[in-house]
Amino acid sequence: MELIRVLANLLILQLSYAQKSSELVFGGDECNINEHRSLVVLFNSNGFLCGGTLINQDWVVTAAHCDSNNFQLLFGVHSKKILNEDEQTRDPKEKFFCPNRKKDDEVDKDIMLIKLDSSVSNSEHIAPLSLPSSPPSVGSVCRIMGWGKTIPTKEIYPDVPHCANINILDHAVCRTAYSWRQVANTTLCAGILQGGRDTCHFDSGGPLICNGIFQGIVSWGGHPCGQPGEPGVYTKVFDYLDWIKSIIAGNKDATCPP
């Protein structure tokens, strides 16, 4: 019954959330059912909130701006309408944010580390994603995925996650595209310069995967998504490795890069 309630909640996508900076995969195709085993759904009583990434059996990484009251995490889901037998639901036991994060900028140091209330079991549709040992290079082909909008200007959301390939771009591209705001050095600029493929509403918090490695967290981008010359901005996981490892090791006073 619990999973039935979960799926019912996921189908109730409140339009009020569509104005947030959360994003969805536009220009992609249905993901292979086994290629997103680390992809996590964050949801509450209002419905779908964000994506996230399982990094081990007890910890999930998502975007800080995805934080909400009383959310849960769902693992192993592919279709919102058809259950996988190995789907698992967990509550957050603890949530960790960068202590030096700017409170008036929801995408500053846009990373949240979640400790689960109990361990998740690996299964056919559930497995953690490896953290990086180095950042991706410009030109790398990376994978985005999520249940976000498939048409940027309409409230149309898929029943299954969509995936697409995009490229790591020079950081100067995003600085030029978004000259009206600061684009932090601790982010990755990624997309297709001519447009047409991008993360979009409700993809926020999900992974940017390069060569099978967890390299980025969906943070923010242009509106509508997928426009030429307006790539996505992703939190660079590599820059937060020390913070992530310190928190997991029990050092709750760990600080993030400036």
Curated annotation (Swiss-Prot):
> Which residues make up the pro-peptide?
19-24
Entry comment describing in which tissues the protein is expressed? Expressed by the venom gland.
Which cellular compartments is it found in?
Answer: Secreted
Organism domain of life: Eukaryota
Tell me which residues are glycosylated: 185
E.C. numbers: 3.4.21.-
Signal peptide as annotated in the record: 1-18
Family matches, as PROSITE patterns: TRYPSIN_DOM (PS50240), TRYPSIN_HIS (PS00134)
Main localization is secreted
Q: Which GO terms describe its cellular component?
A: extracellular region; secretory granule
Indicate the segments forming the Peptidase S1 domain, all copies.
25-249
GO MF terms, alphabetically ordered? serine-type endopeptidase activity; toxin activity
Query: Catalytic residues per the record?
Result: 65, 110, 204
Q: What keywords is this UniProt entry annotated with?
A: Disulfide bond, Fibrinolytic toxin, Glycoprotein, Hemostasis impairing toxin, Hydrolase, Plasminogen activation, Protease, Secreted, Serine protease, Signal, Toxin, Zymogen
Q: Which InterPro entries match?
A: Peptidase_S1_PA (IPR009003), Peptidase_S1_PA_chymotrypsin (IPR043504), Peptidase_S1A (IPR001314), Trypsin_dom (IPR001254), TRYPSIN_HIS (IPR018114)
Judged by the first EC level, this protein's enzyme class is hydrolase
From the record, give the cysteines joined by S-S bonds: 31-163, 50-66, 98-256, 142-210, 174-189, 200-225
- An example of a Gene Ontology BP annotation on this entry? proteolysis
Key word Disulfide bond present: yes
Task of the protein: Snake venom serine protease that activates plasminogen.
Task: Give the protein family.
Answer: Belongs to the peptidase S1 family. Snake venom subfamily.
| Other comments on record | Negative results: does not activate nor degrade prothrombin (F2), factor X (F10), or protein C (PROC) and does not clot fibrinogen.
- Enumerate the PANTHER family for this protein: KALLIKREIN-1, KALLIKREIN-RELATED
Task: Give the quaternary structure.
Answer: Monomer.
Write down what this protein is called.
Venom plasminogen activator TSV-PA
Source organism of the structure: Trimeresurus stejnegeri (Chinese green tree viper)
Specify the taxonomic lineage.
Eukaryota, Metazoa, Chordata, Craniata, Vertebrata
